[in-house]
């Protein structure tokens, strides 16, 4: 079962995201619904693209996800004035389940490092990951097949 979830602020037609706490609460509610009505005891692999990847990472313990898939994780926020951007690496380091990050080689939001349970695959392109969608799909498929999670 695959569920495509659109963030509430996008559904409402807004360009700016809601505060992290509200995004996380909405995500947890969706996962609770899926666990009750859709997953039928199957493992949960949470994931998202860009901001959605951050939400999946921040909520991994609350949702009980067995693994996390991050497409275009925004490691560094856009620079603002003279203030250096603050890395979001702690959000990745807090994840204790297997994780795949698929990142564009020229992603302006940075390149996350590999970690103990964190595999990083770089593909041609930028933050949009549209240049080589076949490579993105292949990386995800290979990772899913190799996951040590019972089906």
Where are each of the predicted segments found?
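Conserved alpha/beta-hydrolase "acid-adjacent" motif
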Residues: 104, 108-113
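Short beta-strand/loop motif that positions the catalytic acidic residue
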Residues: 95, 101-103
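Conserved hydrolase catalytic core segment
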Residues: 58-67
């Amino acid at each position: 079962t695959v569920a495509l979830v659109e963030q509430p602020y996008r559904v409402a037609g807004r360009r700016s995201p809601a505060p992290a706490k509200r995004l996380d609460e909405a995500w947890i509610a969706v996962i609770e619904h899926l666990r009750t009505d859709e997953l039928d005891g199957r493992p949960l692999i949470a994931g998202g693209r860009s901001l959605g990847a951050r939400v999946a990472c921040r909520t991994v313990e609350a949702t009980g996800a067995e693994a996390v898939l991050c497409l275009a994780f925004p490691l560094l926020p856009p620079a603002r004035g003279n203030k250096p951007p603050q890395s979001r690496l702690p959000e990745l380091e807090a994840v204790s389940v297997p994780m795949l990050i698929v990142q564009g080689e020229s992603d302006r939001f940075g390149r996350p490092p590999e970690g103990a349970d964190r595999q990083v695959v770089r593909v041609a392109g930028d933050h949009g990951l549209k240049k080589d969608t076949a490579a993105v799909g292949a990386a995800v498929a290979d990772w899913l097949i190799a996951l040590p999670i019972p089906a």
